[in-house]
Structures are given as C-alpha cells and as structure tokens.
C-alpha cells in the first residue's frame, strides 16, 4: 500500500494562514511587508479591507498562503457590513494557522469579539502584538503579553511592527514550522489569487480613502469597466459608485481637482504593480442604496451574503 505522503517532495510544506483582527489593527500592512511588495490596500480608516485576499509567499520548500481578511467589527446593520463580518469569520475555517493581530496596548470590544472566535479554532494560533516599536520601555509591554497568554494558553505571542518589519522573520519561522507537509498549491511565482482588475479597483478605492479623510463616504465601491493592454499602454476605465449626489461632488472636488489627484496617485501605483505605462480614466456615478442591497452587492463582486 502506498503512503499518501510518498508523492510529497521531501521537506515540502504548504498551508493557509488566516490573518485576523479588528479593523485598522495592521493586518494588510503585515501582509504587504511579509510579501515584500504592496498587494493589499491600506489606509488609516477602519474597514478599508472588504474582501478576503490571498497573498502567497514561496521560499524554498515552504509555501505560506496568507488570507488577508476584513476586520471583524460591531457595526453590522448594512448588508455590506454583514458581508465583511461573514467573510472574516469564514477565514477561520479550514486554515492551518491563524495569526491574530492585536494592538500593543489598546484592547476594544471588537478585539474581544475576535478573541472569542479564535478561542474555538482547532489549528495553531500565533498572536502578533503590533506597533511594539512605539514603546520606549519594553517592560511596559509584559503585562499585556502575559494577559494575552492567559486568554489563549496554547498560542505563541510575538511582538512585531508590521510597518517596520520588526520580528516578522520570527513570525514567519513560527508559521512555517506549523504548516503541514504538502505539495505547493500555487506556482512559485504567483503572489495572489486576485485578478489584475480587482487589484486595480482596490488601488483606486485606497486613494479615495486616503484623500477624503473626515469627509470620507464609506458607501463607495469601484468597478473596472475596461482593462486592456494596447502595445506598451494599459488602458483602465474605472467607475466609482457612490450613494448620494453629495458624495459624488466630494469625490470630484472643486473643478475636478480631487478626482484628478486620486487618478494620478492610483496610476503611479498601478504602473509599479503592472510594470506598464497606464492610461487611467475615472468616472463617478450615483447608485442609491447599493451598500444595503444584497443583489447589487453580488453584482459588484461581493459574493454570497
């Protein structure tokens, strides 16, 4: 009888690693630093990430498939909020390792909500305590680390800085040790499961999130209507959907200056990501109530609700 592991190359490990935590705790920044390039969009605003996205890192015999998730949060009235919470919760199922990202000192109700879900997973858990580079006296961190260990006794606690990369080598080593023996799921040069169209839409949305600040209308999504390479130029037409005329005016800005700036910043990142000259055109359209319309959300790529 042939052993099921006989076909697995010696030393080969591969598995899924869910990165979970409350909104705006540094999950996407962590993924980007691990991958060594910008893949997941980031901003200072909560709920920037709306979809699960795979970030794939292959180093020698180890392939870690990281799942970047929306932050679990309490505001769940609209269909979009329910979608994000379900998406984040679903990531805890059928993964091989969970990285629970928390802030170095701040603990919220939403952190507690994530903790209560993580306590019931059957796979290994790593607690990544983020932003520890901002603490002058490391001894001040110890009570928080001890408390976290009490909450998840089987978990390994790792102080990190997602922004500066501090201790990420330690975190990745712990992940690799916990991955099962397996053939790799993806080609060595593949870094994500998401399409180029999806990544382009996310870059536009990121620039909107960063530009608008306190004016930010959260009822924004981006559709890519055209994505076509013609010679050396990649032509991208993106439609920005909002829910009200007032939001449309905010995005366009005075004499179109804001949408021009959004487009310029998005185009720069796209040219790096796609290694091509990019011609980006943006339009803004009002689609009332889309963020609370399950049918509209499905048509916009938000999956099952």
Swiss-Prot record:
Q: What protein am I looking at?
A: GTPase Era
Location of the region described as G1 in the Swiss-Prot/TrEMBL record: 21-28
| A single cellular component GO annotation | cytosol
Where does it live in the cell? Cytoplasm; Cell inner membrane
What the entry lists under HAMAP family is as follows: GTPase_Era
Q: Which residues form the Era-type G domain?
A: 13-181
Output the GO biological process annotations, alphabetical, semicolon-separated: ribosomal small subunit assembly
PROSITE patterns the UniProt entry points to: G_ERA, KH_TYPE_2
Family matches, as Gene3D superfamilies: 3.30.300.20, P-loop containing nucleotide triphosphate hydrolases (3.40.50.300)
Q: Where is this region: G2?
A: 47-51
Keywords for this protein: Cell inner membrane, Cell membrane, Cytoplasm, GTP-binding, Membrane, Nucleotide-binding, Ribosome biogenesis, RNA-binding, rRNA-binding
Asked whether the UniProt record includes Ribosomal protein among its keywords, one would answer: no
Region labeled G4 — which residues?
Answer: 130-133
Q: Where is this region: G3?
A: 68-71
